[in-house]
Design a protein with these regions (language model features):
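N-terminal glycine-/charge-rich "phosphate-binding" loop or analogous flexible N-terminal tail
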Residues: 1-61
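Residues that form or immediately flank small-molecule/cofactor binding pockets and catalytic motifs
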Residues: 45, 67, 94
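Short acidic low-complexity segments
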Residues: 58-69, 78
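Phosphate/diphosphate ligand-binding glycine-rich loop within oxidoreductases
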Residues: 71-129
Length: 129
């Protein structure tokens, strides 16, 4: 059976200091107008720089469960526990980024987390764009 529509979703960012979004409501409006077979879902968020209502007015559906999505968009790394098997994600993983950390312990913790994230991505057969 051939799917007649394509689904994208915007995740709720997990980091406390992150309020950005990969798409503005205006961009969602342009996409849904141009591609009527595109379904857009947005996980609800109180801290995102755009309101859920603005996304809804632009044609997105506000929904916590985005497991049905073809591509899941985010800004920062998705929490390991929130990764969905066999999905395609587009977010900045910084998995190979080298930076100066405040101390060695902080750097070691970041490296361990990034390795764990990559292992889980491979284990869950996730495509990371």
């Amino acid at each position: 059976m051939i799917k007649k529509y394509f689904t994208i979703s915007i995740i709720k960012e997990a980091r406390i200091d992150e309020n950005r979004s990969p798409f503005t409501p205006d961009q969602i409006q342009v996409l849904t107008d141009k591609f009527p077979n595109l379904h857009v879902f947005v996980q609800p968020s109180k801290k995102r720089c755009f309101k859920d209502e603005d996304y809804a007015k632009a044609g997105a559906k506000i929904k916590e469960d985005i497991s049905h999505s073809d591509i899941i968009f985010g800004v920062k790394e998705v929490e390991i526990s929130k990764l969905i098997e066999n999905k395609c994600y587009l977010f900045f993983s910084h998995t190979t980024k080298v930076r100066n950390y405040i101390n060695q312990a902080t750097q070691d913790k970041a490296i361990i987390y990034k390795k764990e994230l990559l292992r889980e991505i491979l284990k869950k057969n996730i495509t990371l764009i």
